């Protein structure tokens, strides 16, 4: 079966990752000790995508848990699903990265990275046909961003033909945890652009907004935010884990979603999101789901898709529903909002349908959009980055770990290039390609 190896790095990555395992263990009927307590053969049909089966009929997540300090690991281990994970797969240092990308990438992280790769290699060797890797991490801290990107490039070296998929928590515009977030994020994006096949951009601020506005929670905790993320992650991976009418795997997703190799940063969304009190007033229908899924308020990244255009979209519907209705709705959305889809990629919406809904819902849908509006997110980080970098503020923490200012300059220009690439394709029309070629010819003549 097409297996996926899951890696979670840093505090944020471990918390999101653990929540994800709780959600999918629940969907597959696996209890906290790893025993199967489900009631449907479908739950076990493709369980091997994420779990290894031990000799004692225990299902063990194919996951490596990585951090540079023991704290987060301890709380995972003492948490409800702590006994589920393989004890050897907890890999942690003692020093911590102190929110410093250079520590995670070059000094502390580099010392730990080989033991992580051993675990990853071991997991890969147990696989029949490895499909790819998924990493959960944040870009604002030190371990998830610095060591996470180090792991990506090392794994990329060893498994160049496997899909590399990340769930990356971006620093938010208003909610900041660390002052050096813009540095850490820019240095990470610099790596992600080159080394991953698909990156889901998740943003704490967007998650807070969803909790406040839509779910009507007055004081959302990180637990609530992580629950939203895990709902999305569970949705994105549904068609890998359950049989359905139209299936996608990581590679199919990548092929359909990434028109140009560098532009692989997606905005995820999820529907239905309803406040607990108003659930009984809404009917879950395919049109309702589609409507909500494309709504800007449902995006998990703090970018407004109305400010850009969709290059491609993938949607995953879950639950018993008619394919015909789904197709009609998708067509209707595209026709009605055609100005928000680039016209030079016809039929740029891919649909997957899976028969099994998430726990507690009759139907649900997950949205993955590759929109040029994501540049807002990079622009924001870039502005904060240059404001600090201009004054060389906080740089000594990074140069002290052996980094060079050149690296910062490179990372900054790479991110600015990314922004202008998104802009270029946002403005592109069907016919302007020919003019572009003519311009190139003229330039050559002038030279």
UniProtKB/Swiss-Prot annotation:
Residues that bear 5-glutamyl polyglutamate: 438
Motif (MREI motif): 1-4
Chain positions recorded as Mg(2+) binding sites: 69
Subcellular location: Cytoplasm, Cytoskeleton
Function: Tubulin is the major constituent of microtubules, a cylinder consisting of laterally associated linear protofilaments composed of alpha- and beta-tubulin heterodimers. Microtubules grow by the addition of GTP-tubulin dimers to the microtubule end, where a stabilizing cap forms. Below the cap, tubulin dimers are in GDP-bound state, owing to GTPase activity of alpha-tubulin.
Modified residues (Phosphoserine): 172
Principal location: cytoplasm
Gene Ontology molecular function: GTP binding; GTPase activity; metal ion binding; structural constituent of cytoskeleton
Keywords of the record: Cytoplasm, Cytoskeleton, GTP-binding, Isopeptide bond, Magnesium, Metal-binding, Microtubule, Nucleotide-binding, Phosphoprotein
The species this protein was found in: Mus musculus (Mouse)
Pfam families from the UniProt entry: Tubulin (PF00091), Tubulin_C (PF03953)
Domain notes for this protein: The highly acidic C-terminal region may bind cations such as calcium.
Family: Belongs to the tubulin family.
GO biological process: microtubule-based process
Name assigned to this protein: Tubulin beta-6 chain
One GO term describing the cellular component: mitotic spindle
Gene label: Tubb6
UniProt cross-references to CDD domains, sorted A to Z: beta_tubulin
Keyword Calcium: no
Cofactors named for this entry: Mg(2+)
Gene3D superfamilies: Helix hairpin bin, Tubulin/FtsZ, C-terminal domain, Tubulin/FtsZ, GTPase domain
Binding site for GTP: 11, 69, 138, 142-144, 204, 226
Keyword check for Phosphoprotein: yes
Quaternary assembly: Dimer of alpha and beta chains. A typical microtubule is a hollow water-filled tube with an outer diameter of 25 nm and an inner diameter of 15 nM. Alpha-beta heterodimers associate head-to-tail to form protofilaments running lengthwise along the microtubule wall with the beta-tubulin subunit facing the microtubule plus end conferring a structural polarity. Microtubules usually have 13 protofilaments but different protofilament numbers can be found in some organisms and specialized cells.
